[in-house]
Design a protein with these regions (language model features):
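Aromatic-rich, lipid-facing transmembrane alpha helices and their immediate juxtamembrane interface loops
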Residues: 1-174
Length: 174
């Protein structure tokens, strides 16, 4: 695949993973999302020049997601559908989604360009809550806290998580 089509294919692939995770969870299934994320990550890594360094960024994304989503659950702001392996921790499908999101970090960094931290913070603050809103509409999660507080918490998590993951990946590559 030529370089100019890779970001489009990556974006489309991630959207497919997101949709598979959300729709699968809404039906009470973790497996479709986990499998889709695994296939997406595997395909993306097969096209990378140094897949081992990308794996670290992907794992970091999964760890951040596990902590963030578990915190939202413990704070009783969000309840996820298909809560496996525990109803108190982030489910497998949402962690798989965060792992797949880690694949998109290099493209996102190049698209944001200069002032990466500020732009990523703004993108996270806006796009994070929109994704949760869409997921809730599909039945993948339920907002259990007050809507303004829950969306503010999600916006703040993403406003910190996205720039942090991009900075981590940048520093890893130096």
């Amino acid at each position: 695949m030529t370089m100019r089509w890779r970001p489009i294919a990556e974006w489309a692939g991630f959207q497919l993973v997101w949709l598979t995770c959300a729709l699968g969870a809404a039906q009470g299934w973790n497996a479709p999302g986990v499998i889709a994320a695994g296939l997406f990550i595997g395909a993306a890594l097969a096209m990378k020049r140094s897949p081992s360094s990308e794996c670290i960024a992907i794992l970091a994304s999964g760890a951040v997601g596990f902590i963030a989503e578990s915190a939202l659950m413990v704070a009783e702001l969000v309840r996820f559908a298909a809560p496996w392996p525990s109803s108190q921790l982030a489910p497998a499908w949402i962690v798989a989604l965060w792992l797949a999101f880690g694949v998109t970090l290099p493209t996102m960094a190049s698209l944001l360009g200069h002032s990466l931290v500020i732009k990523a913070g703004i993108v996270g603050f806006v796009a994070g809550p929109l994704a949760y809103w869409a997921g809730a509409r599909l039945g993948a999660l339920e907002m259990t806290g007050s809507a303004p507080l829950t969306y503010l918490a999600i916006a703040l998590i993403w406003a910190v998580a996205l720039p942090s993951l991009l900075i981590f990946r940048q520093r890893m590559r130096q």
